[in-house]
């Protein structure tokens, strides 16, 4: 089974939300390694929120601020590749925006070869264009690696009808369609990512990634998180 895991940049950082936290990164490696060892083929799209925040770039034009963010995802991807390999895992980085020794251009034959050798695919640089989120990039890259499931790794155990951090009476919604999520105004992903999921027939699973073992449970079909399906 092929799966694209969407990680936020903040997932790599500690409580301060900046830079790289060794304990947090080691946790990510442990969770990803557990699913690779079970035979799942994994792709990853990571954000850059641990390196750059939109508010810090507010004096720039949006296009240039987005370009800085895209480069931040490359930095995070190179970091992850090194950590994965030092943990005994194979990993390859694909991007359309940079030419570095450790970064390959997106190539479908190369992606298939990497998956056959059980390499983790790390997709850097978003969609390669400004104005698109890493959510949209995750769906696009899932299609390129022929995955029909995107796992959105969050700190919340699924989709709720309102913010559970602000509203104690928030109710979890274990299963819904993209149209329902959009109609309810739920911010699971942005509208462009939703539209692409609907068009391509890709399912999104929202989980609390930081509950140990939840990723593996989700991929094995156990009742964790929330599932958003095409209409």
Swiss-Prot record:
Means of activity regulation: Allosterically activated by GTP. Inhibited by UTP.
Pfam families: AA_kinase
Region (Involved in allosteric activation by GTP): 14-19
Cross-referenced SUPFAM superfamilies: Carbamate kinase-like
Gene Ontology BP annotations: 'de novo' CTP biosynthetic process; UDP biosynthetic process
GO cellular component terms attached to this protein's record: cytoplasm
Domain of life: Bacteria
Binding site for UMP: 66, 127-134
Keywords noted in UniProt: Allosteric enzyme, ATP-binding, Cytoplasm, Kinase, Nucleotide-binding, Pyrimidine biosynthesis, Transferase
Localization of this protein: Cytoplasm
Catalytic activity line of the entry: UMP + ATP = UDP + ADP
EC category name: transferase
Binding site for ATP: 6-9, 49, 53, 154, 160, 163
E.C. number(s) listed in UniProt: 2.7.4.22
GO molecular function, one term: UMP kinase activity
Pathway: Pyrimidine metabolism; CTP biosynthesis via de novo pathway; UDP from UMP (UMPK route): step 1/1
Subunit architecture: Homohexamer.
Family statement drawn from the similarity comment of this UniProt entry: Belongs to the UMP kinase family.
Physiological role: Catalyzes the reversible phosphorylation of UMP to UDP.
Protein's UniProt name: Uridylate kinase
